[in-house]
Amino acid sequence: MPELPEVETVRRGLEPAMAGARIDGFEARRADLRFALQPDLATRLIGQTVKGLGRRAKYLLAELSSGDVLLMHLGMSGSFRVLQGEASGAPGAFHHPRNDDRAHDHVVFRMSNGAVVVFNDPRRFGYMKILAPGEIADEPFLKGLGPEPLGNSFDAAMLASACAGRKTSLKAALLDQRVVAGLGNIYVCEALFGAHLSPKRLAATLATRTGAPTERAERLVEAIRAVLHAAIKAGGSSLRDHRQTSGELGYFQHSFAVYDREGEPCRSKGCDGVVKRFVQNGRSTFWCPKCQK
């Protein structure tokens, strides 16, 4: 499933095509994705200008001139592509061969600037839902989410406070969207490696007995930010279905330090350890037992 860097990459790709433009056409080619699409979705979208395109955790949010917000999630295999030019009725189109299977093009936005934005989702785990202003705070998918790891409010003190007293592993705590929003298996493994912390370590060890952040918490926050920034710069990680809106692959997977590198040498300077894999809470965890403590 796409994690924060992949969703942020998609947001940045959609922004030039959608932000500031009016939705002149909306086509839902089936009645459902993961969930049934709202019957009035087209009525509430057509004619509205996209005032801004934001992201919360792994969700995209299009702010409309009506005050409504369109909530979008990529699911397991969802991707957007932006068509300009010939494919949208004007010169200069581009697309990627991967997107030629139009059978999975389930939703199409036609924008006033000539862009055509297509949502393709073979597995149909993605979803779209329009929310009125008063519904946003109580939306189940958004309610209770923790801080954004790239936001100003996320720091060692906040992370230590969220982990204080927890008897779960550090990895399990970081995957809890109530602790920090948007992280998934890949970037938790990579961040823990960057901070030289074991995924098996108790989450509570990020805080002192008085609840103050330890040096481990400081290192971990720094590592989380660093790996997310690097992944976004690389266009995310393309392991299965992720594509940028241009159709290009992300390439951060070529920079993985531990994820999917079982049996390979540790990349930490001065460490002669080997990357190991074990199953933790039903997911594969990759780490170097020698330098992650």
Curated annotation (Swiss-Prot):
PROSITE patterns hit by this protein:
FPG_CAT (PS51068), ZF_FPG_2 (PS51066)
Kindly provide the name given to this protein in its UniProt entry: Formamidopyrimidine-DNA glycosylase
Q: Which cofactor does it need?
A: Zn(2+)
Question: Tell me, how does this one assemble?
Answer: Monomer.
The encoding gene: mutM
Similarity comment: family membership = Belongs to the FPG family.
Q: Which GO terms describe its molecular function?
A: 8-oxo-7,8-dihydroguanine DNA N-glycosylase activity; class I DNA-(apurinic or apyrimidinic site) endonuclease activity; damaged DNA binding; zinc ion binding
Q: Per UniProt, which keywords does this protein have?
A: DNA damage, DNA repair, DNA-binding, Glycosidase, Hydrolase, Lyase, Metal-binding, Multifunctional enzyme, Zinc, Zinc-finger
Q: What EC designation does it have?
A: 3.2.2.23, 4.2.99.18
- Give the matching Pfam families: Fapy_DNA_glyco, H2TH, zf-FPG_IleRS
Residue intervals of every FPG-type zinc finger in the record: 257-293
Q: Which GO terms are recorded in the biological process aspect for this UniProt protein?
A: base-excision repair
PANTHER family recorded for this chain?
FORMAMIDOPYRIMIDINE-DNA GLYCOSYLASE (PTHR22993:SF9)
Q: Where is the active site?
A: P2, E3, K58, R283
| Amino acids binding DNA | H104, R123, R166
| Presence of the UniProt keyword DNA damage in the record | yes
Q: What does this protein do?
A: Involved in base excision repair of DNA damaged by oxidation or by mutagenic agents. Acts as a DNA glycosylase that recognizes and removes damaged bases. Has a preference for oxidized purines, such as 7,8-dihydro-8-oxoguanine (8-oxoG). Has AP (apurinic/apyrimidinic) lyase activity and introduces nicks in the DNA strand. Cleaves the DNA backbone by beta-delta elimination to generate a single-strand break at the site of the removed base with both 3'- and 5'-phosphates.
**CDD domains named in the record:** EcFpg-like_N (cd08966)
Question: Catalysed reaction per UniProt?
Answer: Hydrolysis of DNA containing ring-opened 7-methylguanine residues, releasing 2,6-diamino-4-hydroxy-5-(N-methyl)formamidopyrimidine; 2'-deoxyribonucleotide-(2'-deoxyribose 5'-phosphate)-2'-deoxyribonucleotide-DNA = a 3'-end 2'-deoxyribonucleotide-(2,3-dehydro-2,3-deoxyribose 5'-phosphate)-DNA + a 5'-end 5'-phospho-2'-deoxyribonucleoside-DNA + H(+)
Copy out the cofactor comment.
Binds 1 zinc ion per subunit.
